[in-house]
Amino acid sequence: MALRFPRFSQGLAQDPTTRRIWFGIATAHDFESHDDITEERLYQNIFASHFGQLAIIFLWTSGNLFHVAWQGNFELWVQDPLHVRPIAHAIWDPHFGQPAVEAFTRGGALGPVNIAYSGVYQWWYTIGLRTNEDLYTGALFLLFLSAISLIAGWLHLQPKWKPSVSWFKNAESRLNHHLSGLFGVSSLAWTGHLVHVAIPASRGEYVRWNNFLDVLPHPQGLGPLFTGQWNLYAQNPDSSSHLFGTAQGAGTAILTLLGGFHPQTQSLWLTDIAHHHLAIAFIFLVAGHMYRTNFGIGHSMKDLLDAHIPPGGRLGRGHEGLYDTINNSLHFQLGLALASLGVITSLVAQHMYSLPAYAFIAQDFTTQAALYTHHQYIAGFIMTGAFAHGAIFFIRDYNPEQNEDNVLARMLEHKEAIISHLSWASLFLGFHTLGLYVHNDVMLAFGTPEKQILIEPIFAQWIQSAHGKTSYGFDVLLSSTSGPAFNAGRSIWLPGWLNAVNENSNSLFLTIGPGDFLVHHAIALGLHTTTLILVKGALDARGSKLMPDKKDFGYSFPCDGPGRGGTCDISAWDAFYLAVFWMLNTIGWVTFYWHWKHITLWQGNVSQFNESSTYLMGWLRDYLWLNSSQLINGYNPFGMNSLSVWAWMFLFGHLVWATGFMFLISWRGYWQELIETLAWAHERTPLANLIRWRDKPVALSIVQARLVGLVHFSVGYIFTYAAFLIASTSGKFG
């Protein structure tokens, strides 16, 4: 009996129903709830699993390099990045007829292939890779790192190599090592790679291990560093006529502050990027020496937090008690990490298109669209996860005595004010934005488009102007041609910035109008409503007026039985579940906005977005319907084309999405009756009844069915939009 799954819970292993399997899977990673778990084993298990995670990441990136080297056209693409379509990998499919073979044979390939929309070609090209051999070398190295990570994970589960709890809770040492080691040293190493390999490659110089020590990255070598003449490293940058990857128009500078974009590649100057990483390295190397460890010097985190007591007394005991609360709660730490990572992932989405770092990626429109959408969706899931673990912290780890009258306790004490203010903001944004959209729709429907309410986003335009955009005529700060900042910017710092801001060929500070104003507020509504649901879930996780003893029921409970009305749907898990729908909704608006604005920008018909985005029918007709036309003709009775796979995925995505509602709308009783009928039929069907099982089939729990429904909804939603996005963009621009 003891060998039955799940091994980590004897109670579940003895469950006579199929609940054993599903609950076993659901709690497999909830180490805290496992039998015989100790705090020490908990930390050690998580630590070891991190190495497994790293191994998977290295294996995955190694696979990307390997397949492109084996089946891609990297060397061909390098010769002409703007016109050769990069190949991700070959397709072998016995279902392909001759028309499909022809449709999918692209990019100079001999047979059917997938085109890469991930940007890896541009990334590898920018960092100095040039041949398939380079890619194979990288793949092998990452495979080696993957194996090392697996060995390290196994090693740290062996008794002699298991770190103690005190090692895991040594916050200062961890901060120092992560700041200096992880960020500082790796940023410095990356600066080194850019200066020694990538920048020479961009100037036609091929640096590898065999000539690494012979090629000086700068004509004067380390001289300027030791003599304090650092400005010499910035002199003679690449000229505006520089052809990337060649010596034509190349300079000798390695660390610059040019600003703006390389005219040919439309990406940031590599010498600016190297300078940026050097600055980051310096800051983090200093930061990683600030906390007190073995030598009795530097800051103590506990002292820092305990000192944060506002003198006016308006925040009670301030940050007292927070050090132990955070340091002893893995859920709190995970919540903070996820919140930070979520914000950074969203910033990556924004900056990858507005300030592209990789050569020629800005001209690969489908890749730009795919990467923006990809990073925004990931950011959404990570951020909702932050609140989920924040709520679990309040249920499992929060100690009221330890946090009496500090900022954490005061958040809980005035949660009604927080939640009601968020609710008011959401209602205000929602009704006003929808009201404006609907008014504009009615005006168009009745043939009086001139009666639309169109609000210019003057504050946002003023901010853009302050940063140097002149087209609005605000004449303020950097857009004021007579101002000292404007004139200094021409020579002293970032001379290319003002040109870049005022050029129409990039995505930096796009011109905005009434359509942008409206969709901005629609997105603000989505963000505030998602936040409202998540914040309410976390702040009410321990209890509410309706259910003061909520924390005793755990993170995810369906209801407290039939005798206590109104306790359904109020667990912290339910808040997370509802928030994910709103998160997906919001990111839908974000990606629709980004994609439509950019399609019109790339096609040169910006007026379509400006005129049609001020009313809902414009979005439905001129964005969704108009851009799905090529997609839904991917295959028809007369034949198929290279969009057919996306057309099929579009259909399949709708199917998966719709399946979600089956789980979300019908509940346990319906499924239990169905299961019992099916089991009855199975037992009476010849041949089928030879197959028997020990577990009595029972329906999923309410919470599990909601999870399954949510997963189908989310996956289907993303599949559908991914197919639409890639097909509509690649169908127009190749």
From Swiss-Prot:
What does the UniProt entry say about where the protein is found?
Plastid, Chloroplast thylakoid membrane
Provide the binding site for [4Fe-4S] cluster.
Answer: C559, C568
Matching PROSITE patterns: PHOTOSYSTEM_I_PSAAB (PS00419)
The protein's matches in InterPro entries, at most eight in alphabetical order, are given as: PSI_PsaA/B, PSI_PsaA/B_CS, PSI_PsaA/B_sf, PSI_PsaB
Give the bilayer topology.
Answer: Multi-pass membrane protein
**Which organism is this entry from?**
Nicotiana tomentosiformis (Tobacco)
User: Which sites bind phylloquinone?
Assistant: W671
Q: How is the cofactor bound?
A: P700 is a chlorophyll a/chlorophyll a' dimer, A0 is one or more chlorophyll a, A1 is one or both phylloquinones and FX is a shared 4Fe-4S iron-sulfur center.
Coiled coil stretches, renumbered = none
Instruction: Give a short account of what the protein does.
Output: PsaA and PsaB bind P700, the primary electron donor of photosystem I (PSI), as well as the electron acceptors A0, A1 and FX. PSI is a plastocyanin-ferredoxin oxidoreductase, converting photonic excitation into a charge separation, which transfers an electron from the donor P700 chlorophyll pair to the spectroscopically characterized acceptors A0, A1, FX, FA and FB in turn. Oxidized P700 is reduced on the lumenal side of the thylakoid membrane by plastocyanin.
Task: Identify the gene encoding this protein.
Answer: psaB
SUPFAM superfamilies of this UniProt entry? Answer: Photosystem I subunits PsaA/PsaB
Q: Can you name this protein?
A: Photosystem I P700 chlorophyll a apoprotein A2
User: What chemistry does it catalyse, as a reaction equation?
Assistant: reduced [plastocyanin] + hnu + oxidized [2Fe-2S]-[ferredoxin] = oxidized [plastocyanin] + reduced [2Fe-2S]-[ferredoxin]
Q: Which residues are chlorophyll a B1-binding? A: H654
Q: PANTHER family, from UniProt?
A: OUTER MEMBRANE PROTEIN, OMPA-RELATED (PTHR30128), PHOTOSYSTEM I P700 CHLOROPHYLL A APOPROTEIN A1-RELATED (PTHR30128:SF19)
Pfam families given in the database record: PsaA_PsaB
Q: Which EC class is this protein assigned?
A: oxidoreductase
